[in-house]
Amino acid sequence: MSKNQLNLQDAFLNQVRKENVGVTIFLINGFQLKGFVKGFDNFTVILESEGKQHMIYKHAISTIIPQRPVNTYLAKGGNEENTPS
């Protein structure tokens, strides 16, 4: 995998962030959080919900469900930011 190519996880999170798609995040303890992804890195996701920000560690996340389908192809290389090498 080249340095400028995103993995599927990053492509998905980046698209829901850029398109401002609401998500439901299920944690491994069964708790649910609903909101909008504002940022992420290798270890955490920042979720904005009801005017508050939550930093969620990725190892605590079980599932992320977007409110509508997300096209991860665009984020993986179908746009000018991430061209295939």
Curated annotation (Swiss-Prot):
Keywords: RNA-binding, Stress response. GO terms for molecular function: RNA binding. One of its GO terms (biological process) is regulation of translation, ncRNA-mediated. InterPro entries: Hfq, LSM_dom_sf, Sm. The keyword RNA-binding applies. GO terms for cellular component: cytosol. Residues 10-70 form the Sm domain. It holds the Pfam family Hfq. Transmembrane segments: none annotated. The keyword Cytoplasm does not apply. Gene3D superfamilies: 2.30.30.100. PANTHER family: RNA-BINDING PROTEIN HFQ. Homohexamer. Belongs to the Hfq family. RNA chaperone that binds small regulatory RNA (sRNAs) and mRNAs to facilitate mRNA translational regulation in response to envelope stress, environmental stress and changes in metabolite concentrations. Also binds with high specificity to tRNAs. This is RNA-binding protein Hfq.
